[in-house]
Each structure stands twice: as C-alpha cells, then as structure tokens.
Amino acid sequence: MTSAWSSEIQHEGLKQWIQEVAELVTPDDIRICNGSDSEYAEVYGIMEKSGVAIPLNPDVHPNCFLVRSSPEDVARVEQFTFICTTKKEDAGPTNNWRDPQEMRQELQGLFRGCMRGRTLYVIPFCMGPLNSPFSLIGVELTDSPYVVCSMKIMTRMGAEVLKSLGTTGSFHKCLHSVGAPLSPGEKDVAWPCNPKNMRIVHFQDDSSVMSFGSGYGGNALLGKKSVALRLASYIARSQGWLAEHMLIIGVTNPEGQKKYFAASFPSACGKTNLAMLMPKIPGWEVECIGDDIAWIRPGPDGRLYAVNPEFGFFGVAPGTSETTNPNALATCKTNSVFTNVALTPDGNVWWEGLTSQPPEGLIDWRGNPWQPGGAPAAHPNSRFTAPVKQCPVLDPQWNSPEGVPIEAIIFGGRRSETIPLVYEALSWQHGVTIGASMSSATTAAIVGEQGKLRHDPFAMLPFCGYNMAHYFDHWLSFASNTSLKLPKIYGVNWFRKDKDGNFIWPGFSDNLRVIEWIFRRTNGEESIAKKTPIGYLPEESSLNLEGLNLSSQALQDLLSVDVSGWLKEVANVREYCKIFGSDLPQTITDELFRIERELK
C-alpha cells in the first residue's frame, strides 16, 4: 500500500500513521488531498457519478451542488458522541464518558476493513490562519468524498498545510469512516452510512478523534466541532485561553469608532443572522469575522483577542431569506454545497422561509415530488456550506493571525418568557453565571425533541471537551489575573413572546438596536442603564426605537425584571447545577444567592 502516496509525505510520523490506518481499514486506494480547485472538481465529479451530488443551475448557482443524505443521517448525534478521559470525573456529568482503552478496542473492531472498496482520502487541514500562534493543524483520514469537498470549504486544507507541518510538526489525528465497506462488484448507495454503529469519539490523552458511521456535517467534518471545540476547549484550559461556540463581529458607529464583539447562542438561535446583520439604522456598519466558533486568548496589552478558526460557513438553510439574512444568501450564491434542501424544476434550491410561497414542482430533500401541506420540502436542519471569503460583509481583519480585541461578550438563547431583551452583567463573575445559566428551546440541529427547554451553559453543552464545572472555573480564573482588561458581558433574548404567543421583538436587522446600546455601554455611558439584581437594564428612553411600532406594554415586557419569573429561574438553575455536585464553583452558588436575595 505504500506506493505513490508515500512520496508526497515528508513527515515520518504522519506517514507511519497513514500506513497503520490503511492496514486496519484496507482501502482500495489512498489519495493525499492537495486542496486545489481541480481536485475539488474531480472529487465532486465522483459524487455526481455516484448519484449523491446534483449540479445546480450554473446561471443561478455557479459551481454549486445539492447533496441528499440518508434520512437516518441528518444531524449531530449527541447520544453517540463520547469524551474519553482516564478519569470519568474529568469528562463530567454533561458528557458521555467511556474508558479510552475500552473504546479504542471497540473502535478497532468497527474500523477493521471498513474502507474496503473505497478510497482513503488524506486531508491535512489547519484551524485558524496558517502560521498564527492560535492555529491547530489536523489530518483527517476519511472515505467520504463529501467530507473532502466540505473540508475544502470549511478549513484551510491541502498542500499548504502539509508544508506548514514540515517533517516534525505536531498534528491532531482525525479518523473518519462512513462505515460501509463494499464487496467486489457490490453497487454503492448514494449516501453510505451505518446508523446502528455511529460513534464520534474524542480521546483527550492524545488529542485525537475517531468518527464512525455518519457522513453528516459535525459528525464527519472533524475540524469543526470535534477539533475546534471539543479538543480545543481541553487544550485551551491547560494553556490559558478559550475555545468557544461564538460568532465574532466588528461593529462601527456613525462616528467611525469600531469595536469587536463575540456572541454565544445555541444552534439555530440566530448566530449566522447576527454575524451577517444588515443594519437598518443609518451610519452603522456590522462586519463578520465568523458565525460559529471563536478562539480567544489574552493579548500582550491585556485585552482578549479572538480568531475564527474556520474558513467557511455551515449555515442552517430554513428561515434564511432576503428579509432575514440577505448576506448569507449572497455568500452561498457560488462555490457552495447545499445539503438536504429542496430542488426546483429549473435546478435551483428552495427551503421553508426562502420565499413566502413554494415554487411548483419541487423535489423534496428525500428526492420525491413534494406536495404542499405535508412534511417540509427541506429538512429542518438542511444546510449550506459556503466559503468565508464570499461573505459580502467580511471584516478586513478576518484572517488576522493575531485576532481582534473583544470588548463585549454576549450570551443568548431562545426564551419566550422571563429573560429580558438585554442586560449587562454586574461583574465578570456575574457574567460567567449568566453564561452558566443559559437555557434555550431546542431546535432541529440536534436529534431529539424540538421545542423543549434545555440547559445549555455557554451554548457549549454538546461541545465542551471536559467537565463543565471545571470549564466554569476556567472562565472565572480570568478575573484573578489583574493584568487582563476583560470585556463586559451581556445577556440577550430576541425571542420573548406576548400573552397571545407572538414574538414581541422584531429581531433580525433590528437587533442592531440592542448592539447599539451595548456599544454605548462599552464606551462608559452610565445614564443609559439602571442597576437591578439581574444586571444593568436599559433605561426605556435609551434604546433607539425609531420606526418600530412597540407599545409601552411590549417595552415593559422586554425591559423589566419579572421578579416571580426570575425567582423560578434561579431555582431552576440551582436545581440543574446539582448535577455538578461539589465541582460547581462556589462563586456561581454565591451569585445565584445574591440575585435571589436582592430580588426578594
């Protein structure tokens, strides 16, 4: 098996690992990916030939294609996602823990011969700008052409990364297989997967990932959630930085002053919409650095600096439209992959929310003619994968190796009651408690029940690679470093409803009105806020509401402290935090008692 491919690899450790894996998984061929456009076209051609990829109308979506996954492989599978640490308590109560030795043995059995009849693709990738002190290099071995094309969009990958790795550089080993070997002469299915044996496994002892059975997004594109969050969060704790499920935006006011904010929301709560927000208020500008992941490190001047480790967007399609997010539509106009959306007769894509009326003659995400009134035409978790460079509001500093200085951190979720539109933490410790207390109505990004309220601290519940209580502690530790100039922390909630069940706040581009208030607060404007037990709330007159038709009752609902609701909220958070036992930092317990005491 060590023939043509081995001469392309100068790194002996990498060469040896590829050889070991090849002996285990027995592929028909091995291919080192160079990341070129011609390679992308060739691999896409393989998918088109196999029937998994459908080219879109080049007049509407040049160099774009639609992929339909198996209905059994459509979202992240948290129940099959594992953190392996020597001691169970290091993984904590919010992760699925397995003994690393036992799990490695189990995976050896699953991976044995799993690439028979397939090509093993070697994907060298870099999370973060090449040659940045922030960056991590990984190598993903996969048998999925879909993963090759998606990783080309989502990461910096190929020959450049291999060169940067040199002959001795360290890298994260990421092994992936769809888990569907082919016998000689056996015809392949369009989307091979192995739903009964799915495993997405993270080994913190050697910072590696093994993923089996799923070809979908976060389960298979191992640079994304696996390396950039689950492994990176563990590394960040030991090295004094943060790996977070956050967007990063640059905001410029009419006077030309610019600030960078990071914001954390659970999946499908409007991260991409906020990251690409198009302001309605004259003179304001919002530019995007990233919509999903932020790596944040203390800089030489004591401020916290953030980079987006990704190279593309993996956005939820349903609900994205010219009204809600015109910049996202412009971003995925060309060179993009659409997964599990509907197809129009003229070779265009469609999903719920794209237009008010569906076009006639749609083919749904399963490949069947679609009838209005039945199941959705596009899967609720259907996606677009698009290069970050195509974003029309991309910030000039998007590729800065040093990152950008963060002046505000924002936490949000999907809450219909109690949580106000915006509030500012009274201290860093209080801000960490706001992050730890986050909960949200669940969405289609995870397999399971939709619409239930689930606790999702820091929107990191599925992504924190170690004990969440130790993670809270790590966040709190930043306050004890007196040389740091820490950003202010805010909570926001775009999803409050009135008694009739209607959203009170218009959301989308109007969220800039809240960002404007936060901007002014970071400039030290005292008179625009009032102090309450839950934090600083806007004075009603301080929010720019020009052009909005909000009643005084609506404004009161959005900006007041619902005492009984908050007492229930504190009790709920305290009850949830019992899962952490004695590991829960005392600071969080104290903050919850303070809020309760002051409310009473």
UniProtKB/Swiss-Prot annotation:
Pathway(s) served: Carbohydrate biosynthesis; gluconeogenesis
EC category name: lyase
Binding positions for GTP per the UniProt entry: 268-273, 383, 414, 508-511
Catalysed conversion reaction: oxaloacetate + GTP = phosphoenolpyruvate + GDP + CO2
Any Pfam family hit: PEPCK_GTP
Reported cofactor(s): Mn(2+)
Single GO MF descriptor: manganese ion binding
InterPro entries, A to Z: PEP_carboxykin_GTP_CS, PEP_carboxykinase_C, PEP_carboxykinase_GTP, PEP_carboxykinase_GTP_C, PEP_carboxykinase_GTP_N, PEP_carboxykinase_N
Cofactor remark from the record: Binds 1 Mn(2+) ion per subunit.
Binding sites annotated in the UniProt record for substrate: 76, 216-218, 267, 381-383
Active site per database record: 269
GO CC aspect terms: cytosol
Disulfide bonds: none
The organism's place on the tree of life at top rank: Bacteria
EC number(s) reported in the record: 4.1.1.32
UniProt KW keywords: Cytoplasm, Decarboxylase, Gluconeogenesis, GTP-binding, Lyase, Manganese, Metal-binding, Nucleotide-binding
Record note on quaternary structure: Monomer.
Family under the similarity heading: Belongs to the phosphoenolpyruvate carboxykinase [GTP] family.
Function: Catalyzes the conversion of oxaloacetate (OAA) to phosphoenolpyruvate (PEP), the rate-limiting step in the metabolic pathway that produces glucose from lactate and other precursors derived from the citric acid cycle.
Name of the featured protein: Phosphoenolpyruvate carboxykinase [GTP]
Organism listed in the record: Chlamydia caviae (strain ATCC VR-813 / DSM 19441 / 03DC25 / GPIC)
